Regions:
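Anion-binding alpha/beta catalytic cores of soluble intermediary-metabolism enzymes, centered on
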Residues: 1-225
Length: 225
């Protein structure tokens, strides 16, 4: 089964709710339209309710989605208190209130943290750093995971590849590379891919030399262990 069809099948009956912080962006609105029409997932869009509803009504989408205005949300004070607690002395109540009003990614991540939604998709108009930072500060990593890494899922016909890390870690050491490889394999399994790991470098069968090649060789050994 094609990877995205498999994902949609797995979500049937789960009542999943996914927040889309960039809710007024046309590409996000088109994505929300497809989500409503093609899946059982409920998109939760952040932004101006009137703008979003008018756009989706013109597109023929009258129900199956939710809109949250961060400036008038019923449990906003609860979100502020929870964010202050989560940051443990690194953010005042006033700072938390301001960032939740101004930054839709922080608002979206707090919805995930509080269990109001099941996940978040962002990054259409925000940088990787602006998208990932709130998640690192609030949700954090799984236990025993030392570093966060990114991964891209590439589909070429019936072939599926997952590349990591091409977004977050600039120059990881050998131990970091090994952990990224292992976590990428775990991510691949989530998409129904039986992972076979390839460690990439500019050396082909030992033809190249240097510190970066040595690091990849060492990372491969660590990953095997």
């Amino acid at each position: 089964m094609e990877v995205f069809e498999s994902l949609k099948t797995n979500l049937v009956g789960k009542n999943a709710r996914i927040v889309l912080p960039e809710g007024e962006e046309p590409r996000i609105l088109q994505a929300a339209k497809r989500i409503v029409k093609e899946t059982d997932v409920t998109p939760v869009l952040l932004g101006n309710p009137d703008k979003i509803r008018i756009y989706l009504e013109i597109e023929g989408v009258l129900e199956g989605y939710e809109v949250i205005d961060p400036h008038s949300y019923a449990v906003f004070d609860e979100m502020v208190a929870s964010l202050v607690e989560r940051r443990k002395g690194k953010m005042t109540e006033e700072e938390a209130r301001q960032i939740l009003q101004d930054d839709v990614n922080y608002f979206g991540v707090m919805l995930v943290h509080l269990g109001i939604v099941d996940g978040m998709v962002s990054g259409a108009i925000h940088s990787t750093a602006a998208t990932v930072r709130p998640a690192l500060q609030i949700i954090k990593t799984r236990p025993n995971v030392k570093r966060t890494s990114g991964a891209f899922l590439m589909v070429r016909g019936s072939e599926r590849y997952l590349f990591g890390d091409c977004a977050i870690n600039i120059n990881p050491d050998a131990e970091g590379l090994a952990e990224i490889a292992i976590n990428s394999a775990i991510t691949a399994k989530m998409f129904g891919i039986d992972p076979k790991i390839a460690m990439l470098s500019y050396s082909t069968k030992g033809s190249g030399f240097g510190e970066s090649v040595d690091k990849v060789v060492e990372a491969t050994k660590i990953a095997h262990e």
